Amino acid sequence: MRKSPRRRWFLLPALALLGAGVAWALVSRPRTPGILRVGAREVEFPATVSRKAFERELLGLGMPGYHLIVWKSGKAAPAALFRAEVTDLQVLDALESLGERPGNALGMATWDERKDPSSKAPDQVIAGPPVEILVKVPGRPEPLTLGEILEDPGGRGFDMRFGGHRANIPKWKSGCVVCLYSCPGSKVGNARYTVRDWVKGTTRFRVKAGAPLPEDGGRVAIIFRLK
């Protein structure tokens, strides 16, 4: 039996709406499982605050002020300011899905030879596209910048770069997402300070007095914005 012209007229708009809905779902769906949002130039994911761990001294063996964001199950998570609900690999995949290529400039010697004054590896600077890091705090209309959160006695500030360093992930399994120095374990690191600077104590990052972060265990959202 042939369909009437009127019935075909009703079906065409319905099919068009269905197709549009499928297309919208494909575009808006997060491309990396566990990531809250992957936009045109942004990646956003949840994390919890752990200020005490970030600033803790452990008889000279800790790493206070070094690890900004670490996957909550990574080896370096006990020293991080923010413990991410997603893995460092997920964040790396999400950033690469936006079309940017990481610098991949730092090998393991950058860290392993940090106490060797004759080695140039610890003086290397992280390379890659610039990344702005923002922290969304519940109840605040605008996200916080790193400069609003952290105190930097060295005064050089922040130049965060998408280093990548995928090849180093299985060597450390640290879960590091962001380090505040040019670290081979970081996916994003700070080009203003090297591992040598860490050894020398050029600066020691701390949370600013009065920084409007939630109490330890409180949730925030981390935004990586490619410039």
Where are these regions (language model features)?
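Long, low-hydrophobicity ectodomains and other hydrophilic envelope-associated domains
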Residues: S28-K227
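Hydrophobic alpha-helical membrane-insertion segments, chiefly the h-region
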Residues: L17-L26
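N-terminal Sec-pathway targeting helices
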Residues: K3-A16
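Intrinsically disordered, low-complexity sequence elements enriched in Ser/Thr/Gly/Pro
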Residues: M1-R6, V27-R29
